[in-house]
């Protein structure tokens, strides 16, 4: 819902999820981070105070539970709904926590969010480094929306985003991985195309990458 811009409906859904979760599972934010979702929706709707209240409540709970992913995520959301310079401090803490965790995708989000705010501060070199790292990590995770956001921010800096340095299986998109896997079994391009419901040309393009 939030991705469609339906923030009021998304907020209502998040709060309702929170009520049900509290009845059955308690308050572990690592399981359902509904307060973070509510905070982002409220921020988009212009209710900054309520957004920050939800975000910091989730951060307190995350720190109580101690799971690095939950803490890093809560710090990132708190940074997104906070004014400068608090936003940068919170996002820096998020990156620090997530670097020590296996949560690679959440780290990619945090790096891009921090890089975006560094760009707004005019710290171009630092912003470029953060955004490029976040983009490379997002590419590993197959997170195209994060990659696009990072590229957009890099272009806003006047930088030309470099192509991913990744090689081998990590450099492949999910679609390319599926095609390569089928090709490795000995199927022809036409057979692969029929199996995946794509054109032979699409298969050829994937195998050429």
Question: Where do the PLM segments sit?
Answer:
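TPR/TPR-like (Sel1-like) alpha-helical repeat modules
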Residues: 56, 125-144, 155
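Helix-turn-helix DNA-binding segment
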Residues: 113, 155, 162-209
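Alpha-solenoid helical repeat architecture
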Residues: 5-9, 21-37, 62-76, 98-110, ...
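Alpha-helical adaptor scaffolds
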Residues: 43-46, 56-100
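Inward-facing hydrophobic residues that define packing positions of alpha-helical scaffold repeats
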Residues: 13-15, 21, 54-55, 91, ...
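Tandem amphipathic alpha-helical repeat scaffolds
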Residues: 1-4, 31-45, 72-84, 109-120, ...
């Amino acid at each position: 819902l939030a991705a469609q811009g339906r923030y009021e409906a998304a907020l209502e859904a998040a709060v309702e999820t929170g009520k049900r979760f509290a009845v059955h599972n308690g308050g572990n934010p690592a399981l359902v981070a509904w307060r973070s979702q509510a905070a982002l929706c409220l921020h988009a709707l212009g209710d900054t105070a309520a957004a920050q209240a939800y975000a910091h409540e989730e951060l307190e709970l995350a720190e109580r539970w101690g799971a690095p992913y939950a803490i890093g995520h809560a710090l990132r959301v708190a940074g997104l709904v906070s004014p400068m310079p608090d936003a940068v401090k919170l996002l820096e803490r998020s990156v620090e926590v997530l670097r020590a965790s296996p949560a690679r995708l959440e780290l990619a989000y945090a790096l891009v969010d921090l890089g975006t705010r560094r760009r707004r501060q005019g710290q171009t070199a630092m912003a470029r480094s953060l955004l490029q790292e976040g983009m490379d990590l997002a590419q590993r995770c197959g997170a195209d929306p994060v990659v696009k956001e990072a590229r957009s921010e890099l272009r806003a800096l006047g930088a030309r985003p470099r192509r991913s340095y990744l090689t081998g299986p990590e450099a492949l998109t999910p679609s390319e991985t599926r095609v390569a896997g089928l090709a490795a079994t000995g199927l022809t391009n036409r057979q692969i195309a029929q199996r995946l419901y794509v054109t032979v040309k699409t298969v050829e393009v994937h195998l050429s990458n």
